[in-house]
Amino acid sequence: MRLVKKEFPDVGELVIGTVKKIAEHGAYVYLDEYDLEAFAPTQEIVQSWFHSIRDYVKEGNKTVFKVISVNPKMRVVEVSLKRVRVDEKEKKLLLYRHRVRVLKLLEIAMKKLNRPAEEALKVMWYLEEQFGDPFKVFEEVVKTGPHVLDDLQLDAKLKEIIIELARQQVELPPTKISGIIKIVSVEGDGVEKIKAALIELEKTLREKFPQISTKIYVVGPPRYRIDLTGQQPKQVEAAFSEAANILQALQKKYKVIGNIQRIEQ
């Protein structure tokens, strides 16, 4: 089944291909997203004449190719393996996995709505046009809220099911914000006061933001590191901002001077 809206890929486009047959002069590849057969010449697969084509591909392998020529009239497509960079391969494989996953989710949605399964593909194409990666809409529903669907030309019932499926099926990687705390004291028992201030800072953050993992540890006096980790990016941002406010309030109590500087990831 064709996963993409257009019938043929463009020259230079990255495509997902499953190796079907290895021949003397190359490999026949099934383009999974286009429901087409393509050919990869040997010189576009092997990196060196000292190697065999089977050192790079085997029947049944699914990997990323780059389109080098297209003849729609003859329905002939040629692809290259060796022209694909590692970073391109990773991004393309991720997009493909997302397309497959979104299509399955939308097929569930169509079943709930008693609509033809074929509509799922059209909705996926629309979401991809709007977001680049169709899975991003599900991630954004979880990350920032259902309002991301407000401007989409989808009916209300479908939006409700997308929100429901996103909350059930999508688990975002945790957001982590780190910073360096520089804190000093001019008091005779300054070490103990710094320790007490940092303990209270950590305790207060954990009480105010129980859903956020808070860790403070020494880098090398007067530098300490704070790590805040949570599932909701806005909550982690709020906790980091509050950490600076709490530290400022603790300076007078413990007679210390300190600040927090964010570590840019």
From Swiss-Prot:
One of its GO terms (molecular function) is translation initiation factor activity. PROSITE patterns: S1 (PS50126). Residues 12-82 form the S1 motif domain. Keywords: Initiation factor, Protein biosynthesis, RNA-binding. It comes from the Archaea. One of its GO terms (biological process) is translational initiation. Pfam families: EIF_2_alpha, S1. Heterotrimer composed of an alpha, a beta and a gamma chain. HAMAP family: eIF_2_alpha (MF_00231). eIF-2 functions in the early steps of protein synthesis by forming a ternary complex with GTP and initiator tRNA. Belongs to the eIF-2-alpha family. This is Translation initiation factor 2 subunit alpha. It comes from Pyrobaculum aerophilum (strain ATCC 51768 / DSM 7523 / JCM 9630 / CIP 104966 / NBRC 100827 / IM2).
